[in-house]
Amino acid sequence: MRTTYMAKPNEVERKWYVVDAAGKTLGRLASEVAAILRGKHKPTFTPHVDCGDHVIIINAEKIELTGKKLTKKLYYRHSLHPGGLKVRTALEMRTNYPEQMLERAIRGMLPKGRLGRQMFKKLHVYRGSEHPHQAQKPEVYELRG
């Protein structure tokens, strides 16, 4: 009788991938990167084990949004003080904080517990085409579509 393979945390081999965000749509890029961080692209995927790979995203400032989202989409945060609600448009976020914009989209697609926080630590987002992870010899990952 065959049994289902369950990966052990010490058996997981991690790779490093580079994804170029230039000209890509935010949500489509985020969903594929979230799947890589979870490890769903591997045949040894196990839901309760962090078996994902490291992902480096470059050119974060060149991410695209469809429709009128650049001006209509709003990002909210609160300082936890009365009247402390801060609001930014997607255009402000892309101009000033493109890393946060991508991180926020991807974090929302990961599991919400301790395992999700562990997976999120394997995401590295940078403006421009330079990154400090050359020593890890990352492979270029081509996104679908």
Curated annotation (Swiss-Prot):
User: Which NCBIfam families does this one have?
Assistant: rplM_bact (TIGR01066)
Q: Which organism does this sequence originate in?
A: Geobacillus sp. (strain WCH70)
Write out the similarity annotation.
Belongs to the universal ribosomal protein uL13 family.
Which InterPro entries does the UniProt record give? Ribosomal_uL13, Ribosomal_uL13_bac-type, Ribosomal_uL13_CS, Ribosomal_uL13_sf
The coding gene here is rplM
Q: What does this protein do?
A: This protein is one of the early assembly proteins of the 50S ribosomal subunit, although it is not seen to bind rRNA by itself. It is important during the early stages of 50S assembly.
Keywords on this record?
A: Ribonucleoprotein, Ribosomal protein
Q: Spell out the protein name for this chain.
A: Large ribosomal subunit protein uL13
Q: Which GO terms describe its cellular component?
A: cytosolic large ribosomal subunit
Q: Which Pfam families match?
A: Ribosomal_L13
Quaternary structure, from the entry: Part of the 50S ribosomal subunit.
Question: What terms describe the molecular function in GO for this protein?
Answer: mRNA binding; structural constituent of ribosome
GO biological process terms, alphabetically, are: negative regulation of translation; translation
